[in-house]
Amino acid sequence: MRPRLSRSGARTRCVALWAVAVGTLLWVLPVTPAMASSHREAPLITQMPKVDGTDWYMFNSYEPGREAYVTMIANYQPLQAPYGGPNYFFMDPDALYEIHIDNTGDGKEDLTFQFRFKNELDNLTVPVGGKAISVPLFNIGPISGPTPPTLNIEETYTLDIVRGGRRSGNQQRVTHAGLRKPTDNIGEKSIPNYETYARSFIHDVSIPGCDGGQGRVFVGQRREPFFINLGEFFDLINLDPLGSPSAKRNILNDVNVTSLILEVPKSCLLRNASSPVIGGWTTASLRQSRILRPHPTFANPTTVGGAWTQVSRLGMPLVNELVIGVKDKDQFNASKPEDDTQFADYVTHPSLPVLIETLFPAAKAPTQFPRTDLVAVFLTGVDDVNQISESNPTPSEMLRLNTGIPATPAAHQNNLGAALCFVHGVLTLKHPGCDPAGFPNGRRPGDDIVDITLRVAMGYLLPLAIAPAGQLPFTDQATGSAAMFDTHFPYLKAPLAGSPQ
């Protein structure tokens, strides 16, 4: 199924489709320590890295034979040094990690997938002078299989589906005996063939009330998939914005991240067969209170209580990092899409083009205000393309995906997503390189969201009289593509090993 785009009103609609990207990259000057798509992007979340959502992907599965599925990837715990032992990167057992789906366009979740984690200490000991002494390390020998006797701490998780409100809806357990998370990639001596080991933790799951076949889930450490010329970008764009797209190094290539990866039949996510568009986002929540125990144990280092309180939120990439003002970043992380009109000024009057013009006077910023085209797509979706509700959608920020647009095979994906589907703002599906299955119609790992948003922010879709620099090929000079990733589930590459260095 292809998007139903008539030529009448094509300019308005294609501008809106492209403009969704502009709302995702609206500042570059550092105020707090900020990293990548949504890494350490708000003051409060820097204090709690285990619940820091870093990237969110949602796309039609392009593994051969999986055309009827959608893959969702929620990444957490940024900037993991591969050698980050001895405790490495457990998920927070006192946190609630969630993936939300809106299939009605009201800005409220209709489906929620909930992940809860549990860390179990085996308390391995060795004999020392006639006494059994607990070891200080994560493992005491090579690791293989799901329950190796040499592993000191095992991490398991549960997966539930909630239909309706996340706290008030009908909650059911996704069935699978013993969902386990693979140990982080300690090193080659501990885990000689990590990817073979990790793939044994890909689980087929049966989702209650979900037709269309079994789903798949994998939770574990992966190599950081996001790519950006980070240092220079935040240093007042200390690079050549019209230079080679691949001239600089992607510094994130040296770190890992923890991924919650879920593949679900499309039919499970849709309101009905005639409504193919969904919106999605990920959140993490903690209990309202956390009290330090004066005598902590491994199982109970703190006492937590109170209602679940959202502390991290991520839909469209770069929004809280580079759109929202510092004074509202923590509020955005705690907010729900249905309440997003409170942040509309950050989209209608974007600051990035003005700041780029300040740094590069020849690059004139667009002069059209307010940017109502951005509001249409950033908050409501584009009619006949990726708008969920066809009548009166609630303005709400989330990543929208038209599941009716066929996935592009990995070998034919364009890292500029839908960019080359437009010529001077006019939708041209037969234009060379056109890839309508890419960002901002969902997001795949190989989509170069930074270059896309830079160009659109400077007016790629606007007339030259309004956007004199709109046709310039802006870039952060760090690039990537689908070739960096696997062509099969879970798509993201194995994490970097802690050893040897």
Summary of predicted features, one role per range:
Residues 34-501:
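Surface-exposed extracytoplasmic segments
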Residues 1-13:
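N-terminal secretory signal peptides that target proteins for export/translocation
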Residues 10, 23-26, 218, 310:
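Residue-level detector of alpha-helical transmembrane segments in integral membrane proteins
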Residues 15-30:
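Bacterial N-terminal signal peptides
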